[in-house]
Amino acid sequence: MENLETQIKNLVKGEVDTSEATREFYSHDASMFELKPDVVVFPKDSEDIQKVVRYVADNKKQNPHLSIVARSAGTCMSGGTVGESIILDVSKHMNKFLSGSKDEATAEPGMYYRDFEKATLEYDAIMPSYPASRDLCAIGGMVANNAGGEKSLEFGKTEKFVKVLRVIFADGKEYEVKPLNKAELDKKIAQNDYEGLIYKKVFDLVENNYDQIKAAKPHVSKDSMGYHLWNIWDRQTGIFDLTQAIVGSQGTLGLVTKITFRLVPAPKNSGTLVIFLRKTEDLGMLINKVLEHKPATFEGFDNYTLMLSFKLFPYFHKSLGWLGMAKLGIKLIPDALKLFRGIPKMVLLVEFNSPTAEETKQKVIQLRKDLQEFKHEALFENDETEAKAKKFWIMRRESFQLLRSKVKDKHTAPFMDDMIVPPAVLPEFLPEIREVINKYKLLATIAGHMGCLLYTSDAADE
């Protein structure tokens, strides 16, 4: 290990750390997995990463244990940022916002999404595929995991917003990857180098198996698993887009050093209908009814999330400040009183955006009218401005972090990653998964996008 540290130190400008404390810290991410690395490298720039990749390629035969795992914020819930050999943490140095406009923005992978959004809001624009961990995650991880979140109902996942990537492939060289027309693709394939070989092999794969690959595409509302081969080559448009393989590949196909995202106008005049659902028997019907109104966002969380939020309410001072927390507490008093009529099984948040505040208000009112058939199973709250609805959006976005850091004598283990559940079977699915959770005496919360329930996180005894 000492030899590995010395050799890498001689290659890179950034720091190289093999201390026990650092290796222990990087043996974890937000998942339940644990792998202790040999060395952690903090690359200064793309050149540092290229040198490490070439070092591993040159020495892999003599030392098969060598491997590279890229890491930014370390919030991956499926173990994608832990490894036993070399960790490359890009969050320390490669975290800059490079350029922007109202249509696109370019940044380095170690930049936190919260900082990226602050920068894009200067252009009155956002990149809308942020996950619930928007205040914790980095944009490199969003690309690596093909992130999706509360805005994905309207806009889709990260794969739809990646315009250009700078990627280091296994030969240790950096390349620009972007959509190509057929003439540009043919030119790439004709290159007598490693890049040309990649394009030739991938094109042969997707062209020779075109019908099978297209038929294999899952017919679900959200899918971030595996390599999305069906998105790479489109015979009808003649576009070949290798970014579609890299997005969601968790660093297994190459290491991303620069990202250009397509942006959309920042939403204005948001309003939310909050639905406190006492029973879940008609949840599938309710979801389909709501979707007819084409909301911008449709989220939900269970009663355990709600009660945990009330129980750990002081935690919110970190994100809101003491004054903000006090204001939030006052706003929650009416909702706390509603709970005396019974704790809801689910809290649903239906958000609309419109050019004017009045249009948003009318959309919220109309949805509430159209859901009157469910009035015996639900309570409704019109939060016709973003400020009014903020209290519930904070609960939704912070639900995992509450379990992760605030439940005493327990450690958080996300034992399931994202799951797709058809709305029609949710009334059957939710009680059964809760039965399993209760059987093993776990404290767990369930939250997600309605129509595709996302994750189940549990806090288990130490």
Give the residues covered by each predicted segment.
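Conserved small/polar residues in nucleotide/adenosyl-binding loops
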Residues: 455-462
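N-terminal glycine-rich flavin-associated loop
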Residues: 8, 25, 31-64, 68, ...
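Terminal amphipathic helices with adjacent charged low-complexity linkers/tails
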Residues: 295-407
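Mobile "lid/hinge" segments at catalytic clefts and subdomain interfaces of large enzymes
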Residues: 148-235, 239-308, 344-346
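Short, conserved charged micro-motifs
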Residues: 48-51, 282-285, 356-364, 428
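Short amphipathic alpha-helix segments
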Residues: 283-297, 312-327, 426-438
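Flexible, glycine/charged-enriched surface loops at secondary-structure junctions
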Residues: 2, 15-20, 63-67, 127-130, ...
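N-terminal flexible segment immediately upstream of the FAD-binding catalytic core
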Residues: 1-57, 61-66, 73-103, 155, ...
